[in-house]
Amino acid sequence: MSDGRVAVIGGGWAGLAAAVTLTGAGRAVTVFETASMLGGRARRVELRNGVVDNGQHILLGAYRQTLGLLRSVHGAHVEPDLLERRRLHLEAPGLFRLRAPPLPAPWNLLTALLTMQGVCRRDRLATVAFVRRLRRTRFHCPPHLTVAALLADQPESVVGWLWEPLCVAALNTPLETASGQIFLNLLREAFTVHARDSDLLLPRVDLGALFPDAAARFIIDRGGEIRLAHNVSGVETLADGVALTSGPAEELFAAVVIAVGPHQLSVLLERLIAATRVTAVAAKVAALAYEPIVTAYLHYPRALKLAQPMLKLDGKPGQWIFDRGQLNGEPGLAAVVISTDVPEARGDHANLAQAIDAQLHRLIGDLPSLSWSQVIAEKRATYACVAGLERPAPGLLAPRLYLAGDYTDQDLPATLEGATRSGVVAARQLLAAHH
């Protein structure tokens, strides 16, 4: 007998969001995670020189689901203890700057565009006119339209300084193939409801401390279980529950949320592939391509003294720099991010670190010699968010079986918010069906 227990396969942000939601509703939850650490593709990494993250993440003020979960597991003081909230500020020192003023939406965006530095007046006005057209269309475009096509009439300077960096950072997909509609969804969420929705929320702690650790405590304190280094190799739906195979053991659960990476899904679904819905989901997932993200950590023997904790770089090769001294109290530590498949990021990590060090000396200047570096490459950091892509919906997959993951169709690219929304959707559908 299952005794009403629920299993969640996958201890990333989607799986933990589902597990926290189920636990909060009084269900006994067991989380299975193949790795020895929770967090999935947004986790802490322990180095000889200290603790970092496998990638530098930021949240937006519009990420209500994620913020709600953080408050559930941490309490009310998520800000400023765990997240530093700043009004939208994008800057390439001496070249470009966009700052959102403290005005209601959408005036904060329109004013920010009108006052952009590094862009001529004519181009600023053209950008404002473009955003006004988007508002009239309610931020909708044909599903197969790429971001490049969407921006075809935009000034080159604005595309280069604003739209392309935002697209690459958010969708991790080049303009030429990225989904115009998903890009517009992000703009709509950030700039059309509340002024604070466009705020940047920068983590002040490592990603493990931000959510996975506290989520695990929340689950365990309420009678749940976290099983690390437990690989689930098989899933089979039965008349009275779902049988999971982990190692030599088989256990029966009342229902299961599958929240593994999309590239891991097909193995789990082998016994279910005859079901029509499962076959359709498997086909959509098999069609996904993936994009890497590379994060280089460079440590200098003294503080960086950057004007902002996050600055845009020139892409040769680093695209963004985060001052971990300002954010995490780690003076001299920089996290430099390269999204999408930049040629330099494919090579030797030591050479890449040297190239980024040279880039920072060129752009920032007044830097001492590098103390140490560590490059972390996530080869499947996100799915390629291309135009016209069909993704499976989160939630019911087969009787007693539910799907969650940042690759599911949540109107968002592969973000922390997309992951947590999918987990909550799956959990709520499960709760509604299995009282």
Regions found by a protein language model. Give the residues of each.
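N-terminal Rossmann-like FAD-binding beta1-loop-alpha1 element of flavoenzymes
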Residues: 4-31
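Glycine-rich FAD pyrophosphate-binding loop
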Residues: 23-47
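Glycine-rich active-site loop/strand segments that organize a redox cofactor
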Residues: 42-61, 128-135
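Mobile amphipathic helical/loop "lid" adjacent to a hydrophobic cofactor/ligand pocket
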Residues: 63-72, 76-180, 184
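Helical element adjacent to the flavin cofactor pocket in flavoenzyme catalytic cores
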Residues: 186-244, 255
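Conserved flavin/dinucleotide-binding core of flavoenzymes
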Residues: 319-435
